[in-house]
Amino acid sequence: MKNKWKRILIGILCVIFATIIAILVHALMPGPGTEVIEDDFDSKLVLALGFPVVASLYFVVLYLQMWGFMGILARKSKLSGPEIGFRFGISFAAIYIVGMQEVILSSSPFTEYGKDFFLYQLSMGLGDGIPVVLLCLALSALCFPKENIKKTGGLRITRDAIVYMLCVSCGFFTQRIIGYIFGYIDSDFKSYPLETILWALTMGATFGIANILISPVFCGNVAKQRMLSLLIISINWIWFNLFIGLIYEGLFLSMLLRGLCDFTGMLIGLFIVQRKGTEL
């Protein structure tokens, strides 16, 4: 019981430090246009609490999820703590960095897509990604049993893993393109079709790779591993998207829908893999 509370305290402290680092990194690595974007934050939450408080709470929840995923679901993993931390950290950092590049000018300080947009979004992605890598490595070093330290799973890129990755990637990509065409997902697809399609392809590939990296962390059969991996990635992705809904009035439901549709698309891809009976 004493060790349990010690792990909880360490986890909370790690989340707090990661949040502080995220705020500092965002402050130290501003992209072009950062001086004007805060003027547009008009949600009731921002008006009531202020943007710094809302942003801090967002990061706390984002990183608390990581602590829960690693500390609860991955605690009985056959892999070593450092390997778990590496897999989680790299996967979610990549999701944040690539996710920030989505071509949505309305949620940025820019009126056209170009170099400044790319650099600004890159700085925002790094501001989220660097702290999550440090957090996952710290949690794996401080909160996992020392007896697991010698166990390692390595990284196996098999044919079945590639099929799994491709199905998840295609599920995301297909859902996004359908959403852009029919308009239930807000985007700048009509103005920047090529850039939007390339981003959707890259984001889909990122989700696919993240899933094959994280799924072996969990215990159980392949189907359970894959479902857990997809669930935690989707939950975190939904919250990641909701940041825009937290700071801009009237966008919360549309951002929630965006994340849920992405999850649905990837879930369909997972079902296709399971139907074929492939295994990692």
Describe the predicted segments one by one.
Residues 1-280:
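Juxtamembrane/disordered regions of integral membrane proteins
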